[in-house]
Amino acid sequence: MRYWLVFLTILITSPVFAACKIDQQQFGVSSQTIKNKLEFSTTFEPIPGFHEEVLTIFEQVCPSLEKTLARDTTLKYHFIQDQLVMIELVKADGNDLLIFEWGRENFDIQEKRKINEEQQFIQVEQSDHIIQLLVRVLPDTVFQNIALVSTQHNDLFELLYEKEESIDEDTLEELDDEDDIEEEN
C-alpha cells in the first residue's frame, strides 16, 4: 500500500514539475508558436521584422513555483528571423538568490555561489544549447539572469551582430554603404 502512495504522489506531481522545464522548449520554433502557448505576453522588437522578444512573467509558465520567484521574474523568448534562439529569465530586483539557486538546482549545476564575489558567471554546455547563470550584487539589489542559448543557430546570432553594427545609434536607421564610405574619408 505504501508503494502505491509513493507512486500516486509521483504521478500527480510530475506534470507540475515538468511544466517548469523551460529547457525542454524546442529552439527554432516561431514566435507565434510561443505566443499561442501563453495566456499573457507582450512583444518588443529591438529590430523590427528581424529581432523580436516575447515577454511574460515566469509564473505563467511555472505556476507551481514559489510566488516570489515566479511573479518577480521576467521570462523572455528571443527570436531572430522568427526562430527561437534564446530563453532568458531575469530578476532585476530583490535581495535574494532565488533565480540563481533555482537555476543551479533545475539544471543540475554543481558550482555553488561564491559569496565573496560581487559578480559570478557560470556557463554549462548541453547538447544543443548553453546554460548561463549570472548573479550581480549591487548596492540596493541583486540582479539575476539565466539564459538558455541555442548552439544550433550561431549563423542567426552572427546575422544579428551584423545587423546591429549596420544601424546608426543616433537615428536607429540602417546605414547604407555610402554613409559608411563618407564616414571613413
Across the structure, where does each feature detected by a protein language model lie?
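Non-cytosolic coordination micro-motifs
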Residues: A18-H51, M86-N185
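Surface-exposed, low-hydrophobicity interaction/linker segments
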Residues: I47-P63
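Mid-chain, structured segments of secreted extracytoplasmic proteins
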Residues: Q60-W102
